[in-house]
C-alpha cells in the first residue's frame, strides 16, 4: 500500500483511555502536506476537533495529535493505526494525561462517495 491509498475520509468508532466501555463516534480526514506528511483532522461526537501530523510506512500510520479541551488546555497524544486495507484502519492511542493503565482504541472505515458505491 502507498501513502496516497489511505488518503480520504473515514467514519470512526473508538474507546477512551480509561476503564469505561463507552464508545465515541466521529470522522477522520487524512490528507498530505507539501512535505508528504499525513495531515489528520478528527471530529469526535460532532463537537470536538483534533488535529495531527504523521507518517506512513509498511502499512503502519503514526500520528501525533493535539486538541483543546477543558479550560482551553491543549492536550497531546499519539495514535498508531494498522492499515489492513485502504478502507479499514485499526488503531490504539494514548495521550499525555490519560490513564497509563489503559490505551484508547479506534477503528476507521472509509466513507465511500455515491460514485464509488455505484461502481
Name what the model sees in each region:
Residues 2-119:
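Central antiparallel beta-sheet cores of small beta-barrel/beta-sandwich binding domains
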Amino acid at each position: 500500500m502507498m501513502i496516497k491509498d489511505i488518503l480520504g475520509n473515514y467514519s470512526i468508532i473508538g474507546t477512551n483511555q480509561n476503564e469505561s466501555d463507552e464508545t465515541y463516534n466521529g470522522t477522520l480526514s487524512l490528507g498530505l502536506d507539501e512535505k508528504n506528511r499525513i495531515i489528520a483532522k478528527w471530529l469526535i461526537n460532532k463537537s470536538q476537533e483534533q488535529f495531527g501530523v504523521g507518517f506512513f510506512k509498511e502499512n503502519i500510520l503514526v500520528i501525533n495529535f493535539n486538541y483543546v479541551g477543558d479550560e482551553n488546555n491543549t492536550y497531546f497524544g499519539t495514535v498508531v493505526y494498522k492499515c489492513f486495507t485502504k478502507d479499514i484502519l485499526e488503531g490504539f492511542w494514548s495521550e499525555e494525561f490519560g490513564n497509563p493503565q489503559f490505551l484508547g482504541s479506534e477503528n476507521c472505515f472509509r466513507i465511500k462517495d455515491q460514485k464509488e458505491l455505484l461502481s
